[in-house]
């Protein structure tokens, strides 16, 4: 089976795992860090805002079952694409919304999807989610992996603002 990877940053990585993890064709979702200038950063280093990293998820998927375009659509429905300085209660560069692309094809799909979202008029504010070339992805510490399964009540609490936003903007 041929597999591909997608990397999405949309705030706290804890909140970004579950929406993808539940989809057919998803083989693995890993929480981690990308986009910075320090190799193998720790959570504490990333939180210090000195490494340039963004919390993200790396998704391994079977493109015969789910397409990259479908993943991008799921991504939009999990984030506030108008907030460049974080997502919901999580603030700062390490929580900024970014689609990290692994190929020209992924870039083309992501850019077309972003243009479609802009043209939809769904949001009154500008769409500021960045589309950037993927950089090395470093898996986060084990206690961050599958957090929504390990600590469901904490994960749910962390998603209150996100879920309210999703209901308001994507309830169609």
Curated annotation (Swiss-Prot):
Note the Gene3D superfamilies from the entry. Answer: Peptide methionine sulphoxide reductase MsrA
Q: Which UniProt keywords apply?
A: Oxidoreductase
Q: Name one GO biological process term.
A: protein modification process
The catalysed reaction is: L-methionyl-[protein] + [thioredoxin]-disulfide + H2O = L-methionyl-(S)-S-oxide-[protein] + [thioredoxin]-dithiol; [thioredoxin]-disulfide + L-methionine + H2O = L-methionine (S)-S-oxide + [thioredoxin]-dithiol
**What Enzyme Commission number(s) apply to this enzyme?**
1.8.4.11
Active site location = 12
**Per its UniProt record, what Pfam families does this chain match?**
PMSR (PF01625)
Q: What class of enzyme is it?
A: oxidoreductase
Q: Where is the signal peptide?
A: none
UniProt keyword annotation of Translocase present: no
Q: Name one GO molecular function term.
A: L-methionine:thioredoxin-disulfide S-oxidoreductase activity
Which InterPro entries does the record associate with it?
Met_Sox_Rdtase_MsrA_dom, Met_Sox_Rdtase_MsrA_sf
Q: Which family does it belong to?
A: Belongs to the MsrA Met sulfoxide reductase family.
NCBIfam families assigned: msrA
Q: Tell me, what does this protein do in biology? A: Has an important function as a repair enzyme for proteins that have been inactivated by oxidation. Catalyzes the reversible oxidation-reduction of methionine sulfoxide in proteins to methionine.
Q: What is this protein called?
A: Peptide methionine sulfoxide reductase MsrA
What is the primary gene name for this protein?
A: msrA
């Amino acid at each position: 089976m041929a597999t591909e990877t997608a990397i999405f940053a949309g705030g706290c990585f804890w909140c970004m795992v579950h929406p993808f993890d539940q989809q057919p064709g998803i083989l693995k979702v890993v929480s981690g860090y990308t986009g910075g200038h320090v190799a193998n950063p720790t959570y504490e280093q990333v939180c210090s805002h000195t490494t340039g990293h963004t919390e993200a998820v790396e998704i391994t998927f079977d493109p015969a079952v789910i397409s990259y375009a479908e993943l991008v659509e799921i991504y939009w429905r999990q984030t506030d694409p108008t907030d460049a300085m974080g997502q919901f209660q999580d603030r700062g560069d390490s929580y900024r919304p970014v689609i990290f692309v692994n190929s020209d094809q992924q870039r083309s799909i992501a850019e077309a999807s972003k243009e479609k979202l802009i043209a939809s008029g769904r949001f009154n504010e500008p769409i500021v989610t960045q589309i950037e070339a993927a950089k090395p992805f470093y898996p986060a510490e084990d206690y961050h992996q599958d957090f929504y399964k390990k600590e469901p009540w904490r994960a749910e609490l962390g998603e209150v603002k996100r879920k309210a936003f999703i209901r308001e903007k994507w309830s169609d």
